[in-house]
Structure formats: C-alpha cells, structure tokens
Swiss-Prot record:
Subcellular location: Cell inner membrane; Cytoplasm
Protein name listed in UniProt: Protein translocase subunit SecA
Family: Belongs to the SecA family.
Top-level taxonomic group: Bacteria
EC numbers on record: 7.4.2.8
Sequence positions that bind Zn(2+): C909, C911, C920, H921
GO biological-process terms attached to the record: intracellular protein transmembrane transport; protein import; protein targeting; protein transport by the Sec complex
Keyword set, alphabetical order: ATP-binding, Cell inner membrane, Cell membrane, Cytoplasm, Membrane, Metal-binding, Nucleotide-binding, Protein transport, Translocase, Translocation, Transport, Zinc
Gene Ontology molecular function terms on file: ATP binding; metal ion binding; protein-exporting ATPase activity
Binding site for ATP: Q87, G105, E106, G107, K108, T109, D515
Length: 925
C-alpha cells in the first residue's frame, strides 16, 4: 500500500527514467533544423568528425544528441523514415546497456540503428544478434543502406560461410548474425592453431533482438561442438596382439633394487589400476612395433612421430591386464557394455575414454567404434556476459524483468507507444473438452471470415496447427499454415496476414520479427516495380501510387471490420509468450482484438486449476459447448503461469551457478591457450614449467628444512634417471663434501637439465624446437581440457546426492571441480615437460613433421557436430550418456564421487605418472 502511494507521488522508476530521456529528446529535436541544411556529403562527414572527437577523449554520452540527430536525418533521406521521439528514447535505453521493451510494430529495427551508429563510432565493432539467418540477412540489407550512407561498413555472419567471409564480416563496423553463430565462432576461435585463423575481434557491444527468446528461453541450452577424432580403429586392432607377446613382471622393484619375484616386461599395479613398462619391456615393445611396421627400425618409442603410439600401447596393456569380461564389462549385441562396480548394473551407452573402450573392443573382437567427444561448450548466459556492453530489445520483457536484472544485470525499460493502443483483449473462454474448444475456435474464425476481418490463430505445437488446419479444410475456409520452419516464406505470409478475409495459423514463434500490416504489405510489390528496367520513372511512380491507393482502400476496410483478430488456442506456461501473440494485433494505434480459448484438458489448467474449474462447471450444470467466461478464472490461470515462470527461473539460476564454475575454468584455459598461441617464443614458458616440475620432484625426495639423514637421494637419482634421462651424481657429491645445502643439490639438477635441453635445441635450432614446443603445449591443453569437460559433466551428474549427506551440492561441486582443475593444470605441466625433455631428435625436418602431425591429429576431427537442442534438466549429453573417463581428470572425478580418498598415500598415483600418490596428486588433496 505504501509502495503504491509513493509511486503515485513520485512515479515509478520506469516513468522517472522516461522523463530523463525526454530531456535529451528535446535536445535532439532542437538539432534537427541544423542537420537538415547539410548536404549528403557533409552529413556523411559527421561520422569521421565524431570518430576524431571520440579519439580525442569525448565520451559517447556527450556525442549522443548530435549522433542521434545525424542518424535520424540520414534515415529520412535514405529510408524515407523519421525516428519517432519514442524511438529516440529506445535508442538511448539501448546505449545505456538496458533492455527496451517496445510493442510490436513500434519499429525496433529502426530504433536499434541509433545505438548501433553511436557505438560503431568507436571502431571496436557492434554485433546485432537475431534469432535466425533470414532476419540477420534481411536487417543487414535493409538497414545497411543507412549505415553505408553514413560511411560505416556492414557484415553478415551466417552459418556455412567461408572463413575469409567470416573474418570480413567481423572486421566490419557492424555485424549482423544469429546467437548460435556468434557463440560457435567464439568456441571455434579457441580451437585454432594459428592466431590468424581467428574470426572474432574482442567482444565489445551487442544488441540482442528478441532478447527474451535468446537470453531466457534458450538460456538453459548450451552450445556444444563435438566430433570424432581421427579414425584409428585399425591401430587398436594391431596393438591388441602386443600384450600377448610381453611377459608380466611379478612384484614391484623397491628403491634398494629388491621386491621383484619374477622379472618381466610390464608391471601391473592392481591397487592403482595402472600398468607400467619396465626398461626391458620398452626395448621389447620397440622391437615388436618395428616388426609390425609401426615404427622404423632402430627407432625409439620416444621419437617425436611415435609419441601417440605409447598411448595406444598402454591402452592395450590395461585392457588385457586390468579389465576382465563379466566382471568389469559384458559383451552384448557386438558391443562392450560397462558393468557398474558398485551396483553390478549394466551402464548402457557409457564408454571409457583415452582409447580404453576401443582397446577392450579390439580385445573382444567386436566392432571398434570411434568415440564422440565434447570439444568445446558454452551457454548463452556466459557467452553474452563476456561483452563489454550488452543491450536488448523485445516486445515482451517486463514479466521477466527480475531475471534480466538478477542474471545479466540488465534493467528493463518499457517504452511508451507512439500512439495509444486500441486493441481489445477479451476474456478467456474455458470449455470442458478440447473438442468443444476447437468447435468454438472454428465458429469465431468463420464469423471473422464472413465479416472480412483477418484472423491470426496461435497454437503451441505443430500437431495442434495441423489438426486445426484439417478442421478448417472440412469447413472449406481457405487458410495458410506456418510452422516456424521456412523463415523467408514465413515472413512473406505473415506480412500479408493483415489482408481482408486472411486466415493464418501459426505456432507461437512463427514469423516473429515481421510486422502484420492491416491491408497487407505492398513494399515487396513496390520493390519489383522499382526494379523493372522496362518501365519509365513516370510509369513506376504511377503504378506505385496505384498500389498505395489499393492498399489504403483495403486498410480502411480491415479497420472497419475491427482490425486483426488474434485467436489463442491454449495458454502457454509463460505469460510472455501469450503477450507476444496478443501483441501481433493493434500495432501503431490500429484497432484489433484477442481472445484465448481453453479447455480443462490443457496441461496448464490440468496441473494447476482443472479440478476447481471442473467442479464449478458441474455445480452450475453447464450444458455441453457452453464456456465459462470469468475474470476470477483468468486471474487464477495467470497466477499458475507466475508459479511456472518462478520455477523455471529457479532452474535457470541454479544451472547458471553450476555453469559459472566451468566458465571460470574455461576462461583460464582459453587465456593460457591464447598466451601459447601469441607468444613469440614458448621456450620461456616451457622452461618455467620444467623448473616447477623439477623443484616438485626434488622436494618430494628432499623436503625443505630437513636433515640430510631424511633425504631420499637414491630414490631421487632413480627418478631422474628413469623419467628424465639425467645422470646426476648426487650421492657422490654429498659424500665428497663436508657439509652441503639442499639448494646446491637442486642447482646441480637444474644445471644438468638445462644442459640436456640446450643440447637438443642446438641440434635443430631454436625456431624449429619452439614450433614443436608450441604444438606439444596446444595438444596437451586441448586433449586434457576435453577430458576435463567430460569429468565435470560426470561430477555434475551425481553431485545432487550430496544433499542426502547434509552437504550443499553447489559448494561440493565448486570445491571438487577446483581440485579437478588444479590436477588438470598439473597434468598439462608434467606432460609438456616430459615430452619436450625426452623427445629424441635426428633432424629439424623430423621435428617439423612431428609438429605438423600433432596439429593435424588434433584438428582432423570427423563428424563435427554443432549442437543446440532443447532439454529439460540442464546440459544435453553429447553422447547418449556421459562417458566415464579414465584419464587423469576422470580418475580424480571417480575418486571425488566415491567420497575421496580411495588411494593410499604410498600407492602409485592414478594419473599414470608412476609416482606415489603422496608425491603427485596427493599433495593437492
């Protein structure tokens, strides 16, 4: 009550904002006579003048009145359209990073030109985001005339465009495109192997058309790029024979050389679920691979071109030694199906990763399938929040104002209409059954048809629209059906839906973005006349005038019949969608009417109010075909809609809280990746990684601030020799010195490592080696990031169960995903260091060839799919079900899910590094 009183005295916030904007409108209007005096060239020259003033430090806000006045004058000359005062207000709202709610027919497309022009002055690029390719192309061509007149370039970003066309589109001052394409381009730019392959510039300013559709209806749906890596099924089958030719070692060698009961080629650590090749095993494996023709004679497994073979060999060894049929998996219908070790149930659709599933398939002789992998993913919520400035416009945003403010920080400003609205919104009519409802709809349509009044019938599904079309066919009522599939044809039909006696059936979203003009739209026909080379200018003018006169007659005829009549066949769960349908009628002060016909069988009524309304109907003994038409029922339906909207908002907000965790990690990984791409020499980065890894290794064996007696020098020398190929006489150095600091030993190791590294670089040259290092780093980041995405997905699947243990699932997810991310960075660091340090080089050509192979292997992805599907619970799995991964990130996820920790401190780390858990990932725990 007090709030209502204050609003009456001071006005609502919306009214106060509009009042402020009207002051600026007065300034713009005062400038109009001045700019009318300028020639076309002088008007065009204002753009460059604005650019220089902005470069000199003048803000866009200071330039706004003049820039808007220039844009309006250019529109009068080029488009023959003058911006209304309310459109100037809309332009200011868009420039202030807000959402402009403008009724259908109030000219949103023209309004956007004001804010687009002003922000394009900066030269940083403006993106205008639409819901489909047709609207992007239409608006770019339509408004492009205005921008080109003012000296600005315009690009269109469409799917299936060539790479150079995309780059040109993004380098234009203004770029039109769809939300999907902007999002996918962002993901693709973060998968390139050369900075010149990127298409997007830094994200500066975006205006999102139909902002409610893109930022709310599609907010739960992530964009996903998935694909199949290079087909290596033959390699898995050839590798499958190798484990049978190798001997298994019994017992693990200890630091003092004891512990081995029977020597062999590989050791199986059943506790850590890992397999390791011994030194003898490496030599034997190289011999076998050479005989199979997989590596050259005398070549090492660690040669650059053979690095990926190690991965396949270990997968085959694990498949044979650790995974047993009818225990870990079963074979059904030519497929390997995983068995859940805790429940014993079959996990149909799930696959191990890292090539393990394929190795088991090869072992069992079933068809080896290629694996689909999520390569990159982002939600619209997180993509659009990356823009420096973001604004939007729609006909219906006020009902979702809280969500726009809460999630995107965007305030909704309702722009007044240019002329008062004359549409009559009639009371809903509620029938007992669907049949009675459709009979009433057909009666209403026939009545309008006979009076010459055009009708637009809105349905919630394609099925309903086709059923209704069948009823109208039976009644011999001519009509058009739109199902939101053919956007271009759809726009033409919608544009003519205002002609007398027109009946148009459309699903709610069909034809959105196209106005329904009473009497039909003559612009297209006028365009054909203008383009006819056989007509003189006088003939063209006469024919166009004749068209306009005919249109005026039809326009008056339709107005007299009551304007466009909207028939809703069902209430949507969102009031916003209902308002969009209603908003089709009564554009720019035209007359119009709307009515919804409901039945107790409708989902919304059935769930929320059906029983209550049915009881009223039965008490009143209402005859068949007689509707209820009462304000109390309509209000209870709106109350039900508010409940559903609230529930959907909670779901979207919760999903965003989970996705924000992945988003922060995505930003970090993409930043690291871009640093690697743009670095002149990655040698310094690799040197820092190497130093970090060696310090960690050293501190595992020689802890800081400890006595000499506590140092494990023998273990350290063994690790340096086996993992790094470094012979550093640490024990002899200690024996020969009276006293020695641990830092001196560390310096010895660093010196030996640097000398070995420099000798490799000297063999091939700094430039060649830097190229190889860059490829290895990118390969490691990309491979492990893809695994990490699957690990996060897997963690997300079961995290809600933590609630039963009185823990907050969101906090648990944050904590454990951070641990996973820390491990991911650790694994990348170790892998890059190990590969670049141990690579065996013969010539620069060999190294360059290896770099090319690495990049080709990563970029050669078959069956790449761009997904953006509707789904209910959150993230749509790329595969039928999320893949349990066996890589490092997944090993950690499995541990986390099982409640952490399962690995003993002295057990080998599940990441496969060969170190003890306490000396590897155990430190992170």
């Amino acid at each position: 009550m007090i709030t209502g009183l204050l609003k009456k005295v001071f006005g609502s916030r919306n009214e106060r904002l509009i009042k402020q904007y009207r002051r600026t409108v007065a300034q713009i209007n005062a400038l109009e006579p001045k700019f009318e005096q300028l020639s076309d060239d002088e008007l065009r020259g204002m753009t460059e003048a604005f650019r220089q003033r902005h470069a000199g430090g003048e803000s866009l806000e200071a330039l706004l009145p003049e820039a808007f006045a220039v844009c309006r004058e250019a529109s009068k000359r080029v488009m023959k359209m003058r911006h209304f005062d309310v459109q100037l207000i809309g332009g200011m709202v868009l420039n202030d990073n807000k959402i402009a709610e403008m009724r259908t027919g109030e000219g949103k497309t023209l309004t956007a030109t004001l804010a687009v022009y002003l922000n394009a002055i900066t030269g940083k690029g403006v993106h205008v985001v639409t819901v489909n390719d047709y609207l992007a192309q239409r608006d770019a061509e339509w408004m492009g005339r205005l921008y080109n007149f003012l000296g600005l370039s315009v690009g269109v970003n469409l799917s299936q465009m060539a790479h150079d066309q995309k780059q040109a589109a993004y380098n234009a001052d203004i770029t039109y495109g769809t939300n999907n394409e902007f999002g996918f381009d962002y993901l693709r730019d973060n998968m390139v192997y050369d900075p010149s392959q990127r298409v997007q510039r830094p994200l500066h300013y975006a205006i999102v058309d139909e902002v409610d559709s893109i930022l709310i209806d599609e907010a739960r749906t992530p964009l996903i790029i998935s694909g199949q890596a290079e087909n290596q099924t033959d390699l898995y089958q050839r590798m499958n024979g190798i484990p049978k030719l190798l001997e298994r070692q019994i017992g693990e060698e200890k630091a003092d050389g004891t512990g081995v009961e029977k020597p062999g080629d590989y050791y199986v650590d059943e506790k850590g679920h890992q397999v390791y090749l011994t030194e003898a095993g490496h030599e034997k494996a190289e011999e076998i691979l050479s005989q199979l023709g997989l590596i050259g004679e005398g070549e090492s497994l660690y040669a650059p071109q053979n690095i990926t073979l190690m991965h396949h060999l270990y997968a085959a060894l694990r498949a044979h030694s650790l995974f047993h049929r009818d225990q870990h998996y079963v074979v059904q219908n030519d497929e390997v199906v995983i068995v859940d070790e805790f429940t014993g149930r079959l996990m149909t659709g799930r696959r191990w990763s890292d090539g393990l599933h394929q190795a088991v398939e090869a072992k069992e002789g079933v068809t080896v399938q290629q694996e689909n992998q999520t390569l990159a993913t982002v939600t619209f919520q997180n993509y659009f929040r990356m823009y420096e400035k973001l604004a939007g416009m729609t006909g219906t945003a006020d009902t979702e104002a809280y969500e726009f403010q809460e999630i995107y920080g965007l305030e909704v400003v309702v722009i007044p209409t240019n002329r008062p609205t004359q549409r009559k919104d009639l009371q809903d009519q509620i029938y007992k059954t669907g049949k009675e409802r459709y009979d009433a709809v057909v009666r209403d349509i026939r009545d309008c048809y006979e009076r010459g009044q055009p009708v637009l019938v809105g349905t919630t599904s394609i099925e309903t629209s086709e059923y209704l079309s069948g009823l109208l066919d039976r009644e011999q009522l001519p009509h058009q059906v739109l199902n939101a599939k053919q956007h271009a044809r759809e726009a033409e039909i919608v544009a003519q839906a205002g002609r007398p006696k027109m009946i148009t059936i459309a699903t709610n979203m069909a034809g959105r973005g196209t106005d329904i003009v009473l009497g039909g739209n003559v612009e297209k026909q006028a365009g054909f006349i203008e383009a006819d080379p056989n007509l003189s200018d006088a003939d063209k003018a006469a024919r166009i005038q004749q068209l306009k006169d005919e249109w005026q007659s039809l326009h008056e005829q339709v107005k007299a019949a009551g304007g466009l009549h909207i028939v809703g066949t069902e209430r949507h769960e969102s009031r916003r969608i209902d308002n969009q349908l209603r908003g089709r009628a009564g554009r720019q002060g035209d007359p119009g009417s709307s009515r919804f016909y409901l039945s107790l069988d409708d989902q919304l009524l059935r769930i929320f109010a059906g029983d209550r309304v049915r009881a009223i109907m039965e008490r009143l003994k209402m005859p068949e075909g007689e509707p209820i038409e009462a304000g109390i029922v309509t209000r209870s339906i709106e109350s039900a809609q508010r409940k559903v909207e609230g529930r959907n908002f909670d779901i979207r907000k919760q999903l965003l809280q989970y996705d924000d965790v992945a988003n922060d990690q995505r930003k970090e990984i993409y930043k690291l990746r871009n640093d690697v791409l743009e670095a002149n020499d990655v040698g310094e980065m690799v040197a820092n990684l190497r130093e970090s890894v060696l310090i960690e290794l050293f501190r595992d064996h020689v802890p800081a601030d400890t006595m000499e007696e506590q140092w494990n020098i023998a273990g350290l020398e063994t690790r340096l020799r086996e993992d790094w190929g470094l012979e550093v006489p640490l024990a002899k150095t200690i024996e020969g010195a009276q006293s020695i600091e641990d830092e001196e030993l560390l310096n010895l190791i660093m010196k030996a490592a640097t000398e070995r590294y420099e000798s490799k670089v000297a063999m091939v040259g700094r430039e060649s080696f830097a190229g190889f290092e860059r490829s290895v780093m990118l390969q490691s980041i990309d491979t492990h990031w893809r695994e990490h995405l699957a690990a996060l997905d897997h963690l997300r699947q079961g995290i809600h169960l933590r609630g039963y243990a009185q823990k907050d699932p969101k906090q648990e997810y944050k904590r454990e995903s951070f641990e996973l991310f820390a491990r991911l960075l650790d694994v990348i660091k170790n892998e890059v260091t190990r590969v670049t340090f141990n690579v065996q080089i013969q010539s620069p050509e060999e190294l360059e060839q290896a770099s090319e192979q690495i990049e080709e292997g990563l970029s050669h992805l078959e069956n790449v799919q761009y997904k953006h599907d509707e789904f209910a619970e959150g993230r749509e799995p790329v595969e039928e079900a999320p893949s349990p991964r066996t890589g490092t990130a997944m090993a950690a996820a499995e541990l986390a899910l099982a409640g952490m920790p399962k690995v003993g401190r002295n057990d080998p780390c599940p990441c496969g590094s060969g170190k003890k858990f306490k000396q590897c990932h155990g430190k992170l725990s």
